[in-house]
């Protein structure tokens, strides 16, 4: 099988790489993809570390006016809609901000992470499709 090489300018190559990166990101964040718990937890840990840990702490215990996620009735609840609504809309007059700017996959991942971290070992996972439906 012959190999074909196409020589392009640096600008064209950079544009091509950017396009391929967008394609990969779009595939990775397909809200119809069905995830397994281990993969959602791994992604959720990254989302939590980036967006949540400053207030809720690495321990999930929160502090002061910041509610604990570890042992939280909302987090432990089998009704995912309660936690989804808080992440999409915020709560407590803005003390808990809305995170609706995050992708469905990132939101599903961080919810699944909180449901299965610390003492919260629910075995529950939230799929991105649940977030997509809740946004409508």
Where are these regions (language model features)?
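Peptidyl-prolyl cis-trans isomerase
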Residues: 65
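Conserved beta-strand positions that form and line the central face of beta-propeller blades
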Residues: 4, 68, 95-98
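Interdomain boundary/hinge segments at the C-termini of tandem beta-sandwich modules
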Residues: 5-9
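Sequence/structural segment immediately N-terminal to covalent heme-attachment motifs in c-type
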Residues: 38-62, 71-89
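Flexible coil segments in periplasmic/lumen-exposed cytochrome c-class electron-transfer proteins
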Residues: 10, 14-46, 50, 97-136
């Amino acid at each position: 099988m012959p190999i074909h090489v196409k020589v392009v300018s640096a600008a064209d190559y950079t544009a091509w790489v950017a396009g391929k990166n967008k394609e990969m990101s779009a595939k990775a964040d397909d809200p119809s993809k069905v995830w397994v718990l281990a993969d959602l937890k791994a992604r959720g840990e990254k989302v939590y570390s980036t967006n949540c840990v400053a207030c809720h702490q690495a321990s999930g215990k929160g502090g002061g006016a910041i509610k604990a996620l570890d042992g939280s009735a909302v987090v432990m609840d089998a009704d995912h809609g309660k936690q989804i609504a808080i992440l999409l809309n915020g709560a407590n007059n803005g003390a808990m901000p809305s995170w609706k700017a995050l992708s469905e996959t990132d939101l599903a991942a961080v919810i699944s992470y909180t449901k299965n971290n610390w003492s919260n070992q629910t075995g529950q996972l939230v799929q991105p499709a649940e977030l997509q439906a809740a946004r409508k």
